[in-house]
Amino acid sequence: ISEPKQGMATSDNNRFLKFWHEVDFVNIGFNFLNTKDAYDSNLKWFPYNKGGEFRRWYGNQEYVVNWKNDGQEIKKFREYKNATLSSNMGVAGLSDIFKESITWSFVSSSNFGVRYSPNGFLFDVGGSSIFPDKKDIKYLTSFLCSNVTLVFLRIFSPTINFQAGDLKLLPIIFSQSDSNSIKQSIEILTQENIDISKEEWDSRETSWDFTKNELLKHLVPKGTL
């Protein structure tokens, strides 16, 4: 259906990663669809999936990565490290950056859950991702958020790490017919869950899509709660 991909390691997160609110907001490139448009924008920072705490459906969108000029600084730093320290660093998954995806946290103490990620993100080794066809992404998201998936992953990976290779082993029933009513019902429910999770995430001031405190939404006309 789709190949789980391990994300990149910058080799120096303190240098190349920032919380989105630590940088100039107008210098963040949101919603880019491909590397060419991102390069032509001359922007420096781009959304970055880095895993984070256990959360299903949507969220954990906190970081941006320095990907100006198609990651020029990161790539040069990698070359320097490889030459001076004989390290084997890599910038993986570049063919899929900025694509709509499903992402998850590499480390989790007890639970597993994936999150829908819209276009515009790069991704970390701690936030590995899957890039299915658009027509399958909601259905696959629901399966990966199910208890069935958790049971299988606890068998495949008894540790606290959920690697891309573990997800490759998951069995899934997948209809080839787009008119399948069960699949359509699942996709509708999945979208509802994503919408609910997004609304909750964006109600926090730590979200870059935050607009208004939840308490203010309940003010009566006279300005009291």
Protein language model features and the residues they cover:
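S-adenosyl-L-methionine
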Residues: 1-58, 62-225
